[in-house]
């Protein structure tokens, strides 16, 4: 198995330019993000999990791992190839077969991946790629022949899947929405923070489940941070995803653009103050200006609902305890960021927060060896690392008792 997975990883790296262009054409993300982040990370996941293929006996001490069986994998439109790698790499390393369904708006990289799998001489039938819309996904969920289902997407659809599979002997992993808090303390390196905040919310047009869409700033530095953020937003370039100078590309679909616009209008109606830089948008396509809200209340929809777009809500706090309370005051629990020079404060905050991933003085940093997943309505189960192997195996006693 390791031989095949290593081949896939190498072929992805060799054909990275093809995949990068395809991801940007299909999904609208800037080519520099597809080229420098998505494709290298996808390849890295296959490289990492290839190393586990012959070491599974050492991953679970005292237990004998067996393949779960047939895995159904449904992936979203925001990171098509990367999410395919998150599902396929551990599933193959553990000896499973997979039926992979990409999102209906971004199927192209999955189809090119099928060509790579054939090029790697993966045996026929080990990975099956099924394209289609919601009806296709529902048919896969309700098929009855799956031993394991893994889904990344919206919380509403994830809840529906969980209800449909209730009472059935199918292992389930759900990686759903988020409303992450990026928390800035007064002792933080402000310029570094600003770059981390921008990366945390405007990367991939905000189409990121773990995006830092809520900014919590300690009161003494709140005005300074907002001032620097506004200045930085004025330098962001919105436009053609295939232009290497573009910072924000296209919104994925008309449906998503309508949702973003509606929630931004709701924020204005509820009394928040909207700032958008004076930048030109292309005449054709689905584009939205990077947006910043101040004077935001925790009860506002923009502070509670996942917008999944380039929209940042700024709130303030006085004490670490208040920051924790506000950060946890959401239905989600996927990720968070903490910016401070005090290591003890980082550790204390991380323990108090209900977030599956907590970044310290950075944001949106990923590694295949680090597990990723959430709490509450952000789902359950972990992907990546040794913990990410567990959903793809059945553990039997090691020996006869």
Language-model-detected regions and their locations in the chain:
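Residue-level signal for inorganic ion chemistry
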Residues: 1, 23, 46, 95, ...
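Glycine-rich loop-to-alpha-helix module at the N-terminal edge of alpha/beta enzyme cores
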Residues: 1-56
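Hydrophobic face of alpha-helices
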Residues: 2-9, 20, 43, 110, ...
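Generic secondary-structure signature for well-ordered alpha-helical cores
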Residues: 10-17, 28, 32, 51, ...
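Residues at or immediately preceding the N-termini of alpha-helices
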Residues: 16, 31, 190, 222, ...
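Rossmann-like NAD(P) dinucleotide-binding subdomain of oxidoreductase/dehydrogenase enzymes
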Residues: 55-192, 317
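Conserved C-terminal structural/oligomerization subdomain of aldehyde/semialdehyde dehydrogenase
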Residues: 122, 146, 183, 237, ...
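ALDH superfamily catalytic-core signature
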Residues: 156-297, 360
């Amino acid at each position: 198995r390791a031989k095949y997975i290593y081949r896939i990883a190498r072929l992805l790296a060799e054909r990275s330019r093809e995949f990068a262009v395809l991801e940007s054409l299909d999904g609208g993300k800037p080519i520099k993000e597809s080229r420098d982040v998505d494709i290298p990370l996808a390849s890295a996941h296959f490289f990492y999990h290839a190393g586990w293929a012959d070491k599974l006996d050492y991953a679970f001490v005292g237990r004998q791992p067996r393949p779960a069986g047939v895995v159904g994998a449904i992936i979203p439109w925001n990171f098509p190839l990367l999410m395919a790698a998150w599902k396929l790499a551990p599933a193959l390393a553990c000896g499973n077969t997979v039926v992979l369904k990409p999102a209906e708006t971004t199927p192209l990289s999955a189809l090119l991946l099928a060509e790579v799998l054939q090029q790697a001489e993966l045996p026929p039938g080990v990975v099956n790629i099924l394209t289609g819309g919601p009806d296709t996904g529902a048919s896969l969920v309700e098929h009855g022949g799956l031993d394991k289902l893994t889904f990344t997407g919206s919380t509403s659809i994830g809840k529906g899947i969980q209800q449909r599979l209730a009472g059935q002997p199918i292992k389930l992993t759900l990686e759903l929405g988020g409303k992450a808090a990026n928390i800035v303390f007064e002792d933080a390196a402000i310029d570094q923070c600003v770059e981390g905040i921008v990366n945390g919310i405007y990367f991939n047009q905000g189409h990121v489940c773990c995006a830092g869409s809520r900014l919590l700033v300690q009161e003494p530095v709140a005005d300074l941070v907002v001032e620097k953020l506004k200045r930085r937003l004025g330098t962001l370039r919105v436009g053609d995803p295939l232009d290497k100078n573009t910072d924000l590309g296209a919104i994925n679909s008309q449906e998503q653009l309508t949702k973003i616009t509606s929630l931004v209008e709701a924020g204005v109606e509820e009394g928040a103050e909207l700032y958008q830089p004076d930048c030109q948008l292309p005449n054709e396509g689905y584009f939205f200006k990077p947006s910043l809200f101040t004077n935001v209340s925790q009860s506002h929809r923009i502070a509670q609902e996942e917008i999944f777009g380039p929209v940042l809500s700024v709130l303030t706090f006085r004490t670490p305890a208040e920051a924790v309370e506000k950060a946890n005051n959401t239905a989600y629990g996927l990720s968070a960021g903490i910016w401070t020079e005090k290591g003890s404060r980082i550790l204390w905050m991380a323990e108090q927060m209900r977030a599956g991933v907590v970044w310290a003085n950075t944001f949106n940093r990923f590694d295949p060896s680090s597990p990723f997943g959430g709490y509450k309505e952000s789902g359950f189960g972990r992907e990546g690392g040794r913990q990410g192997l567990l959903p793809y195996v059945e553990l039997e006693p090691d020996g006869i008792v």
